[in-house]
């Protein structure tokens, strides 16, 4: 039977376009994994959406004198366009500003309250004397007490990833007017993490989690080592999910964004089921079986700054609610730097996805971001390296192999030729192809995407060497049967590589699928649909029908006689002048 696989992807704040660090950190790895699992024949549900209640949205709205809804309507469509252009195959990319999400968040809050995992407590809140109001944590900046980073946010430091409260900062100030922040008492609801800690530890210790990435495991262990304490889940805010209690104290408070955002994975699954016409289908990924086992393997693709929210806080919420599936794996990526320096949106030192997706092939961007991906350590986008790797690996290795084999076959046979007797060189390539297929499969199962892509490219190099050694362009003139055998073996390898590369390079893999004489779709793409927001305005979502790729993860069974079509290059060679042009463009926009 096929497995149920939940691919849950980090919810981006709808306050600005994506840069390549966002794509490399969560969305592209999730898509590669989801496409692979669908090809395996498993039942995949890949969900995410725009986080509409994040403080950065409120900050942007206040600075421009517009509403948070206006900010969301500006940037949410840009996310969908980037995902479409790059082929990020969500079953549903929605947003937290929906009636469904508000209902689900309310249900979870009330269940936790009923089960005794929420409590009220008076805390100290950040207050602006100049504005006469409480400030959300992200409206506060100061020096990090842990590492000394001068622009640490009120809830977390971008310099070291440390989580803290605003009063922990040195010289805290308001991001709205730069005025010093004071602190006043205010009452809020807290999630009782200390009460949930024994169950959380039991879950984490129930299996060997060495398959988690080292940094994910280390972050989680460090949090537990320090001991868990209650964490506020409401804030003095005007924008967000209302606190569902009959208490005038909480009339002007809202559920805190970190609590409602992680619930989005669950609420998006419910929305997907409702839209699919099978309103209870979400349960097949979420509701535990009678014996307590999970109905699915749940993978959460995030950046490293969100690890504790997904390995501690979200599992604690699920445990407190009861009978919902806990994460199986949390493949958290490190950060992608740019030309050796950390990306900074405030300085505009970033490579914006809407810009580069217009200038370069989607598969070229996808290839570089995985081949150079920040899986276990920070990595770096370098324009010189991008051009070199696209030209030497995508164009000269994989693209050249596919083009040579298909061109020779189409020109001399018009179809997959009937092979003759095999020699040792043929058998060696056949064995190498089978071995690579098994190795890539194992690596993808372990979410080792970078190594899997390297393994596939190594097979392309081996196949190129086989062609160079066998010289079928000469054999077609002197030994047709031998030429037919060489091209048959090479075609089988190219066809297998098409499948291995498909999760990484869906656009070129689909074109190659058609050149090899297949009908149908091996790499379906997402599309945009329109629905309504709670205020009645049009709301866009991203969805797709990916059933056509199910069960196609097999080594080649290309049969003699199958038509082979005239090829065109799969990838565009990049001119070396691109490096200087892009660096000039980058430096022209940077702010001091």
UniProtKB/Swiss-Prot annotation:
Keywords: Aminoacyl-tRNA synthetase, ATP-binding, Cytoplasm, Ligase, Metal-binding, Nucleotide-binding, Protein biosynthesis, Zinc. The keyword Nucleotide-binding applies. A motif ('HIGH' region) lies at residues 12-22. It holds the Pfam family Anticodon_3. One of its GO terms (molecular function) is ATP binding. InterPro entries: aa-tRNA-synth_I_CS (IPR001412), Anticodon_Met (IPR041872), Met-tRNA_ligase_1 (IPR023458), Met-tRNA_synth (IPR014758), Methionyl/Leucyl_tRNA_Synth (IPR015413), MetRS_core (IPR033911), MetRS_Zn (IPR029038), Rossmann-like_a/b/a_fold (IPR014729). Zn(2+) binds at residues 144, 147, 157, 160. Its cofactor is Zn(2+). Monomer. This is Methionine--tRNA ligase. It comes from Roseiflexus sp. (strain RS-1).
């Amino acid at each position: 039977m096929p497995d149920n696989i939940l691919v849950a992807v980090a919810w981006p704040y709808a306050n600005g376009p994506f840069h390549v660090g966002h794509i490399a950190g969560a969305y592209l790895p999730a898509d590669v994994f989801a496409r692979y699992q669908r090809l395996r024949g498993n039942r995949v549900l890949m969900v995410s959406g725009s986080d509409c209640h994040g403080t950065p949205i409120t900050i942007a709205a206040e600075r421009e004198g517009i509403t948070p809804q206006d900010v969301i309507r500006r940037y949410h469509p840009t996310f969908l366009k980037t995902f479409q252009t790059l082929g990020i195959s969500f079953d549903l990319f929605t947003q937290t500003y929906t009636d469904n999400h508000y209902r689900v968040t309310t249900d979870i809050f009330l269940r936790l309250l009923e089960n005794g995992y929420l409590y009220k407590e008076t805390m100290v809140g950040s207050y602006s004397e100049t504005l006469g109001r409480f400030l959300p944590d992200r409206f506060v900046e100061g020096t990090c007490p842990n590492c000394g980073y001068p622009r640490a946010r009120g809830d977390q430091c971008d310099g070291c990833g440390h989580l803290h409260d605003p009063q922990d900062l040195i010289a805290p100030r308001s991001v709205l007017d730069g005025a010093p922040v004071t602190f006043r008492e205010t009452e809020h609801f807290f999630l009782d993490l200390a009460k949930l800690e024994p169950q959380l530890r039991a879950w984490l210790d129930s299996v060997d989690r060495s398959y988690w990435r080292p940094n994910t495991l280390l972050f989680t262990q460090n949090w537990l080592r320090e001991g868990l304490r209650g964490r506020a889940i409401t804030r003095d805010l005007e924008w967000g999910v209302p606190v569902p209690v009959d208490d005038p104290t909480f009339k002007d408070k809202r559920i805190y964004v970190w609590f409602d955002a992680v619930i989005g994975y669950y609420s998006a699954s419910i929305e997907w089921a409702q839209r699919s016409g099978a309103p209870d289908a979400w349960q097949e990924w979420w509701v535990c079986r009678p014996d307590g086992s999970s109905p699915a393997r749940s993978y959460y693709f995030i950046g490293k700054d969100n690890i504790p929210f997904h390995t501690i806080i979200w599992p604690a919420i699920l445990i407190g609610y009861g009978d919902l599936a806990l994460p199986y794996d949390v493949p958290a990526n490190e950060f992608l730097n740019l030309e050796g320096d950390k990306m900074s949106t405030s300085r505009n030192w970033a490579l914006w996805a809407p810009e580069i997706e217009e200038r370069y092939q989607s598969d070229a961007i996808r290839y570089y971001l995985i081949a150079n991906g920040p899986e276990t350590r920070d990595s770096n986008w370098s324009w010189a390296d991008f051009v070199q790797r696209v030209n030497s690996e995508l164009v000269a290795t994989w693209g050249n192999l596919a083009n040579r084999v298909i061109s020779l076959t189409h020109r001399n046979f018009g179809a997959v030729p009937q092979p003759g007797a095999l020699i040792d060189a043929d058998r060696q390539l056949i064995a190498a192809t089978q071995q690579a297929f098994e190795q890539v499969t194992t690596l993808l199962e372990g979410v080792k995407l970078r190594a899997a892509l390297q393994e596939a490219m190594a097979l392309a190099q081996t196949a190129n060497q086989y062609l160079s050694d066998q010289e079928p362009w000469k054999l077609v003139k002197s030994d047709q049967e031998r030429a037919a055998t060489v091209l048959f073996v090479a075609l089988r390898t190219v066809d297998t590589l098409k499948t291995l590369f498909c999760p990484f390079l869906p656009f070129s893999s689909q074109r190659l699928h058609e050149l090899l004489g297949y009908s149908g779709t091996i790499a379906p793409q997402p599309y945009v649909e329109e629905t309504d927001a709670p205020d009645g305005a049009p709301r866009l979502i991203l969805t797709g029908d990916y059933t056509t790729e199910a069960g196609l993860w097999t080594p080649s069974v290309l049969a003699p006689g199958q038509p082979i079509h005239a090829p065109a290059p799969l990838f565009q060679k990049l001119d070396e002048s691109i490096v200087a042009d892009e660096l000039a463009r980058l430096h022209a926009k940077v702010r001091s």
